[in-house]
Amino acid sequence: MSGQNSENFIKMHGTGNNFVIIDSCSANDLNWNYKKIANQNGCDQVIVITNSSLADCFMHIYNADGSKAEMCGNAARCVGYLLMSEKGTEYITIELVNKRILECFKVGDKSIKVNMGKPLLKWHKIPLSTECDTLHLPIELEMLKDPVAVNIGNPHIVFFVDSVNEIPLQSLGPKLENHALFPQKINISIAQVEKSGEIALRVWERGTGITASCGSAACAALVTSTLRGYLTVQQTSVNLPGGKLLIEWANNVFMTGDIGFL
């Protein structure tokens, strides 16, 4: 990765989810102004790659507001592609916070599959500030109500609606992200399960706002759709404004999608 450009950072996207990726393996330097970098480059997250004793690299994730995130599936696909290209392999591992390890597989020219791990559904694992039924959270805001909560390496709630385009996510997102039920704030998804069995999805990402794509949100959408009984299969396409992700749930959740350079 270190030879990609003179400034030692790369601009990439995973289905429209935009990143600045900084290779800091040689220095293990995390002393960057992440909010400034995000503002100057118009990216959703800033990703810093450092060395890991447990995996091929350690991936640090910073939101557009400078806050840290625990998981970013789309960024993992981008980093996975870079490392696999550098190493000449079709499999690498990425370490995240809490010693979580993501497995990445090359399945096409620029198509990467990521093992996102097991979804967590207990209220204290989301986490929530008080004990609740995570399949039916007691939240109602304008036309949104009765969301499902799940942790896919980071906390998510999913609302099911008849039309994702009718929801004013720009105004509702900040209120839901900062709801008192979520001590670590929350990622918000608006999901529409279509007759075809595919899912249309719009996302408000914690610390960033509306994004064109969010890999962990797509995983959350499939898991919660299945738990609610809206889907009878455990594999489907999730259609986001930035593109399509294939999500599979077989004990662990797997996400497959394309990457690109900006």
Swiss-Prot record:
Location in the cell: Cytoplasm
Which keywords belong to this entry?
Answer: Amino-acid biosynthesis, Cytoplasm, Isomerase, Lysine biosynthesis
* Substrates-to-products reaction catalysed: (2S,6S)-2,6-diaminopimelate = meso-2,6-diaminopimelate
- Provide one Gene Ontology biological process annotation: lysine biosynthetic process via diaminopimelate
Alphabetically, the GO molecular function entries are: diaminopimelate epimerase activity
Question: Is Cytoplasm there in the keyword field?
Answer: yes
Q: Which EC numbers characterise this protein's activity in its record?
A: 5.1.1.7
Note the InterPro entries from the entry: DAP_epimerase_AS, DAP_epimerase_DapF
Q: What does the entry list as the binding residues for substrate?
A: 17, 45, 63, 73-74, 154, 187, 205-206, 215-216
Q: Which proteins does it associate with, and in what oligomeric form?
A: Homodimer.
Name assigned to this protein: Diaminopimelate epimerase
Origin species, per record, is Wolbachia sp. subsp. Drosophila simulans (strain wRi)
In the UniProt record, the gene name given for this protein reads dapF
